[in-house]
A protein has these predicted regions:
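Outer-membrane beta-barrel domain signature, strongest for Gram-negative TonB-dependent receptors
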Residues: 1-148
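Signature of Gram-negative outer-membrane beta-barrel scaffolds
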Residues: 110-112, 116, 138-265, 269
Length: 269
């Protein structure tokens, strides 16, 4: 939404004021997985060239690579596409006593559709005043303010046949093998002793806000002397930014939650 206002107290002076406010949800979906085979058909381990990597029997590997390349060319068994049926079956049938002891009865999804959000609130205000003098010189001055908050988080969009998904950092778990470092929400883990089970519509993986504040003032003066013109201008502004973490992450337990130190910059010209 935008509002503009113009006021002319006399024929030599004009005042303009404009403000705008923008908000909404913005996200895009993607496939993600945990504790399951990579479902991407073009994953490098599924490519014909991978058959030749570190092969001890080059002749046999070459034949296997050629056969796989032929399947790709002819799209045998829809090899070039995601196998959604396989993912649904895996999710619906993934049950074990350890999970049920923690989360209760239900099938744990290995594959889900996530929606990565960048939801914004953005407010802008700009004011300008212009004055024309008797010698036709003009003085124009203005000020502007902007306040922006962008909320970054991941959301479960579709469990693909399962009942819940376990919210852990699969890359931290793979690289460090430490259940503490793999937690996306340490406060929850410390309270309950296990990672959260998330369902459709729940936030998971990451959750933080980025804040921005900016303001500035400026002025210009223009005049003419015979056939010559002169214009002078000056501007002064400031910008501050900071991150606000909403969860304490296992990889960075001491500085991931709460407000970071502000980064501030002054500009002048």
């Amino acid at each position: 939404a935008m509002i503009n206002y113009t006021f002319e107290p006399n024929e030599h002076t004009q005042f303009n004021l404009a403000t705008s406010f923008r908000f909404g949800k913005n996200g895009y979906s993607a496939l993600t997985w945990y504790d399951g085979a990579d479902p991407r058909p073009d994953y490098y381990r599924y490519m014909p060239s991978y058959k030749l990597l570190n092969a001890t029997d080059l002749e046999a590997a070459s034949m296997a690579a050629a056969s796989l390349a032929d399947q790709w060319m002819r799209n045998v068994g829809n090899i070039r596409h995601f196998d959604w049926d396989e993912m649904y079956q895996t999710n619906m049938n993934f049950r074990n006593a350890e999970d049920e002891a923690i989360y209760g009865p239900g099938a744990r999804s290995n594959y889900i559709i996530e929606e990565r959000h960048t939801d914004q609130l953005d407010w802008n205000l700009a004011a300008q005043i212009s004055r024309i003098y008797k010698d036709n010189s003009r003085l124009t001055a203005g000020a502007n303010v902007r306040i922006n908050r962008t909320w970054y988080y991941d959301e479960v969009k579709d469990l693909l046949g399962g009942d819940y998904y376990v919210d852990v950092d699969k890359f931290a778990q793979r690289d460090f093998g430490d259940p503490i470092m793999a937690q996306n929400d340490m406060d929850y883990y410390n309270q309950y002793g296990h990672a959260r089970a998330v369902r459709e519509g729940d936030k998971f993986s990451y959750n933080y806000k980025a804040h921005l504040r900016s303001s500035g003032v400026w002025a210009t003066y223009a005049t003419r002397f015979g056939g010559f013109g002169m214009k002078l201008g000056a501007e002064l502004g400031g910008l501050s930014m900071w991150r606000e973490g909403l969860w304490r992450k296992g990889l960075f337990p001491d500085n991931s939650k709460g407000r970071d130190r502000k980064s501030t910059r002054l500009n002048s010209s």
